[in-house]
Amino acid sequence: MINFSRNSRSIIANWWWTVDKMLLTLITLIIVIGIFLNFSASPSVANRIGVGSFHFIKRQLLFLPLAYGLMLFLSMKGLKAVRRTAIIGYLITIALMIMTLFWGEETKGASRWIRIFGFSLQPSEFIKPTFAVVAAWLFEGQKKYRDFPGDLLSICLYGFTLILLLLQPDVGMSMVMSAIWLFQFFLSGLSLVLVTVLGLLGVGLLVTAYFMFPHVQVRFQQFMASENNLSFQVKKSLEAFQNGNLFGMGPGEGVVKMHIPDAHTDFIFAVAAEEYGMLLCLAIVALYACVVVRAMLISCKDNNLFIILAAAGLSASFGLQGIINMASTMHLMPTKGMTLPFISYGGSSLLATALGMGMLLAITRKNVHAEDKDETY
C-alpha cells in the first residue's frame, strides 16, 4: 500500500505533495470534456465515411490512457530528465519530419503524416513542446555561460525547423512555433527593438506564404469573403453557434455535426456550442486561460531562467493553439487545420499535448527538485 504522508520517501508520495494540484485538475477537466464531446461529435463523422459508429471513439480511448499515463510519468521527473526528454524528443521529431517529406501520406495538399506500425503519426505536433523546452535551455545557457552561443544555436535550430515545416507545408504550425520562440526570446532579455524587427520579418514571411502556397490563399480569401461565400464548414460552424444559443440543444441533439466533415477534430468547438451552448464554450475558454495563467504565475516565482522560459513556452503554446482553433471555428480568423488540445480527436495531438503538459507539471512542481536547478547541463 502506498504511503501518501509528507514524510514518505516514495516517488508517488513525493510527487503528490509537490505537483501543482490546481494545474493538474484544470488539465484533467479539459480531458474529461474532450471525452464527452468526442462521444457527441465522432459517431456522425464515422457513419458518414462508412466505418463503425464508435470507430473514432475507440481509437481515442486507446490513446487517452497512454497520453494521460505519459503526462503523469513525466510530471514526476526533475529538470534534468525534462531537458533530456525534450532534446531526444526534438531530435526524433526532426528525423521523422525529414522522413515525412519523402515517405509521408499526402492529405489536402500537405505531407504531414507518416505511417508507423499501422498508425498515422503527425511528427510536427511534437515540435511545439520539444522545441519550446530546447529553446528555453539554449536561452538560459547564453545567460549562464559567457562562452556558450545559446542564442545563435536557438536561431539556427529555429530556422532549420521552420524550413522543414514550410516544406510540408504547415503554415499554421510554423506560426505557432514562431510566436512561442519569439515570446521566449523576448523573456530571455532580447530588446524590444529586435523583437519588433523579428516580428516584422514574421509578417513578411506570412505575406510570402500567401503567394507561395495556394491553400493559404484560398483560406484567406474565404475568410475575407462575404457571408454568402464562406466555406461550407465555416457556414455550418456559425450555424451551430446560432442553434446552441446560451444553453444548447442538449447532449447528442446537435444536427450540424451531421454535415461538417471535421466535426470531431478542427470544428469540435462548434459541436460543443450547439449541444451545450455558450456556457460550456465560455467554461472551456476559462479552463485554457487558467492553465496558462496558473503556469505563468508559478514559474514567475522561481529564479531559474530555464523554468520561467520553458513554462512560458509550454503554457503559451497550449493556450495559443486553443485560441487559434476556437477563433477559426467562430470565423474570427482563417481556418488553420489545428486541433483543440486534449479535446479534438487525434492520437498525435493527444500524445504531443500530454508530452508538453507532463513537462509543464514537472517544472512547476515545488522545490523538491531544487538540488537539480543549479545543474543545467
Stretches with model-predicted labels:
Residues 11-27:
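N-terminal membrane topogenic signal
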Residues 117-127, 167-169, 245, 249, ...:
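Glycine/serine-rich anion-binding loops at beta->alpha junctions
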Residues 170-175, 249-253, 263-265, 282, ...:
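Transmembrane helix boundary and interhelical junction motifs in multipass membrane proteins
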